Amino acid sequence: MNKQFSLNVNGKDHTVEADPDMPLLYALRDDLGLNNPHFGCGLAQCGACTVHLDGQPVRSCVTPLSAVGNGKVVTLAGLGTPEKPHPLQTAYVEEEVPQCGYCINGWIMTAAAFLRDNKKPTEAQIKESLTGLKCRCGTHISILRAVKRAATMMG
């Protein structure tokens, strides 16, 4: 049975009517029309669907709407703006990371939460924080450089 959910996404309030077990990802993409996060695997194994829920990265493909509650959801679109991009977004461009771009959502959202809480991370800590994310284009070295650059920018 469908239920009404009040969602705060990227600072704006929305109402969605859906099954409580429906993944947050579907509400974001289908009901709210956001083009990120992406559907990758549907099993929380690739990270393309990562969003922040109350500041913590979650895989929205397996997060039911009923688990969101009054939480605040931030997607990649809410992390920065074209006028004032998040340091990770700037670093990704400067390091020329994007190829196909499909996985960027997961990498940036995961790294943003990590860097917020870890001001001067080691390379090993960065690698550990990004464990479980997938990039089919194989840009892992460039991604690591971008996260290190962003850490310096945010330092």
Residue ranges and their predicted role:
Residues 1-155:
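Signature of N-terminal electron-transfer/Fe-S-associated modules in redox systems
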